């Protein structure tokens, strides 16, 4: 599986179709459809700054919370607009977990294959972002919440193009969540844990170095409790920061403000 993630089919222009475009809120927006190598499509929205650049780039990958209205690529739209207005090319993307029923439809037999496909799709989104005119490859941030953060770590350990990371309310091991449903016991459970250990974020987060990392966690998060957060953070190499907020799994407005400020400071040229 790791070889499939490494030797992926790179994105070509023919894989992307423009659905709609317009200018508002001080930036240009483009709604796009991406054809994947796996026979299905993914939506994304591109936010382009005004001016000549060069521009930093940010890939935003949302969380999974089926009871929340922003458990999809809409989660980071407002943030992407703000960052684009201040000089960053931003892309918000559809994922496997954009489907509210994704978790109950899958089984552990699907998780490794789904993970491989998700990493390939993320790498192809990176291809697209860095192919934008005036994109600065030396200022490329990956921002991921929940599964978005976990798969970002895995993708980034293979694809070293992102130069900065914000990892939000992520857990260090996929079985922490993928064993919620369906229930596994005994040898099948242990076999699954062993299988997924090859791609667990905690096994790969050190490979993001020397990219600066910002970890954001809530102090009342049942899915990424403080103990797991500290283990995950401890496995990462410097430079790194971890912030704990008075929040649950969805984090807080305070964390949003801190994240935007961190990105602006790290990527430079964003006022």
List PLM regions with ranges:
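N-terminal cap/lid segment of alpha/beta-hydrolase-fold proteins
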Residues: 9-52
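Short beta-strand element of the alpha/beta-hydrolase
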Residues: 44, 54-65
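Cap/lid segment of the alpha/beta-hydrolase catalytic domain
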Residues: 64-120, 177-180
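Active-site nucleophile elbow and catalytic-triad environment of alpha/beta-hydrolase enzymes
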Residues: 190-205
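C-terminal catalytic histidine-bearing segment of alpha/beta-hydrolase fold enzymes
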Residues: 234-271
């Amino acid at each position: 599986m790791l070889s499939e993630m490494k030797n992926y089919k790179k994105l070509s222009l023919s894989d992307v179709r423009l659905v709609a475009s317009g200018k508002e809120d001080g930036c240009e927006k483009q709604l796009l459809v991406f054809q994947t190598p796996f026979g299905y499509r993914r939506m994304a929205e591109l936010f382009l700054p005004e001016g000549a650049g060069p521009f930093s780039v940010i890939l935003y990958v949302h969380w999974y919370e089926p009871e929340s209205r922003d458990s999809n690529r809409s989660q980071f739209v407002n943030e992407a607009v703000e960052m684009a207005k201040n000089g960053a090319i931003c892309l918000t993307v559809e994922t496997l977990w954009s489907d509210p029923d994704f978790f109950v439809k899958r089984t552990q037999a699907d998780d490794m294959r789904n993970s491989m496909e998700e990493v390939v799709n993320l790498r192809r989104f990176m291809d697209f972002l860095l192919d934008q005119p005036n994109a600065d490859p030396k200022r490329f941030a990956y921002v991921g919440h929940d599964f978005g953060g976990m798969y970002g770590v895995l993708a980034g350990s293979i694809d070293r193009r992102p130069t900065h990371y914000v990892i939000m309310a992520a857990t260090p091991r996929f079985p922490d969540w993928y064993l919620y449903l369906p229930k596994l016991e005994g040898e099948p459970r242990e076999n699954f844990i062993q299988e997924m250990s090859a791609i667990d974020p905690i096994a790969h987060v050190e490979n993001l170095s020397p990219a600066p990392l910002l970890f954001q966690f809530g102090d009342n998060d049942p899915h990424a409790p403080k103990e797991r957060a500290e283990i995950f953070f401890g496995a990462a190499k410097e430079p790194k920061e971890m912030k704990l907020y008075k929040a649950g799994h969805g984090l807080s407005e305070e964390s949003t403000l801190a994240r935007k400020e961190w990105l602006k400071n790290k990527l430079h040229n964003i006022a």
